[in-house]
């Protein structure tokens, strides 16, 4: 699944790059240079190249809206088909991970929470820079209702962020971090026990 998503995003980046160089005298090589060190090419890298070329002074501004706002007549895109959310949950758990929904307030994902809890959603991101106090209270209350983990963070993207937020300005409280670590330990024990039961069952079958 991860390879499929990576490939789709790579193709989308290439298509968008071609559309950009048709509009502006920048090279694909320069755009790719701006994405050096990244796992993929993103809109911010394209804006970085356009900044270098003198077409804008900021990553997020009028030109960004002109190129990447769906309502703009100059909108350029290459839609990426993402995996089904249930497949994503299964993949996270199969890899030994904990599935947490990122900033539900920003994407208005509240209705989806109730749907995903039975499918194995483990937690919700409560503390996020763009979530107001009332939104945080709402998310936390939902997490308590469904006995979900709670996390937080700055959503730090370095220079590629619309609002500069230094690392550590929005953190997961210690009690939530402890719950997260304890949950991980519990899951590991459950997985180990399940593997032992499978091995014992196979041993009996082969006896």
Positions of predicted regions on the chain:
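Conserved acidic, metal-coordinating active-site core of Asp-based
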Residues: 36-98
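Conserved phosphoryl-transfer catalytic core
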Residues: 7-34
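Short coil/loop linkers at secondary-structure junctions
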Residues: 23-27, 56, 149
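Short, amphipathic alpha-helical segments
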Residues: 3-14, 37-40, 82
């Amino acid at each position: 699944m991860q390879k499929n998503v990576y490939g789709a995003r790579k193709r989308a980046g290439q298509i968008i790059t071609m559309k950009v160089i048709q509009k502006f005298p920048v090279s694909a090589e320069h755009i790719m240079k701006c994405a050096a060190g990244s796992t993929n090419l993103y809109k911010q890298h394209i804006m970085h190249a356009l900044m270098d070329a003198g077409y804008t002074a900021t990553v997020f501004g009028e030109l960004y809206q002109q190129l990447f706002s769906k309502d703009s007549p100059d909108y350029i895109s290459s839609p990426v088909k993402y995996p089904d959310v249930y497949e994503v949950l299964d993949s996270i758990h199969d890899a030994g991970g904990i599935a947490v929904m990122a900033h539900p307030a920003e994407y208005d994902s509240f209705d989806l929470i109730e749907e995903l809890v039975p499918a194995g959603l483990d937690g919700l991101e409560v503390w996020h820079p763009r979530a107001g106090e009332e939104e945080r209270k709402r998310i936390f209350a939902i997490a308590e209702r469904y006995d979900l983990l709670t996390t937080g963070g700055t959503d730090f993207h370095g220079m590629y962020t619309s609002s500069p937020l230094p690392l550590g300005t929005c953190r997961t409280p210690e009690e939530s971090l402890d719950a997260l670590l304890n949950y991980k330990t519990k899951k590991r024990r459950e997985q180990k026990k399940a593997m032992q039961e499978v091995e014992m069952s196979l041993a009996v079958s082969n006896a």
